[in-house]
Amino acid sequence: MVEYVYSVSQDSTNPNAIGFRNELNVAEMKGAIELEATYIDLGRGSLPKLAGSTKIRLRSRHLQAESADEMKGTQRLGSDKAEGKFFMGAIEHDGYLKYNQVRLDSITGITFSVTSAGAGGNIEVRKGAFDGPLLGSVKVEVNGSWDAFHDLHTKVVPSTGKSDLYLVFQNEKNRGGLMNVDWIEFQTKSTQNEK
């Protein structure tokens, strides 16, 4: 079973594996990997060939903030200092980034690449909905720069299965210009053991 894909070449040569069991070696990954399996039998006598195909898409555990499946109260902005040259900024109180169907049972924490020359605030990690169960939170302090990104980490309450994951931005006193977010990275039991 695959927990998270750590690396895949963006310049894929479309590798193929033939047979019932196989292994594909992959290089560094910047996005996601899509695996497709197809089976065609030979048929028999007057019976036609049978075919089946399935495809799955595996998300990297390192995600650009702007790759969110849904967003509110935030804008995609550009900067040479951001990884991938883009980040999410102009973040408002009660704004959020939503990532669809994240496998939560292996996540032990999340690292955020953030910066703030504005109001700062909190990032809440919520399960299933904007106001769903709180899994973790991190306080983003003002560091006086809009592009001096630094890493902050929060532990995540153990959860089960797959669910939509919401990163909700909070600052009731200063409702706009809270922070910028460049990327997020899910920490797992296996990544903790690597350190």
Language-model-detected regions and their locations in the chain:
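Extracytoplasmic
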Residues: M1-K195
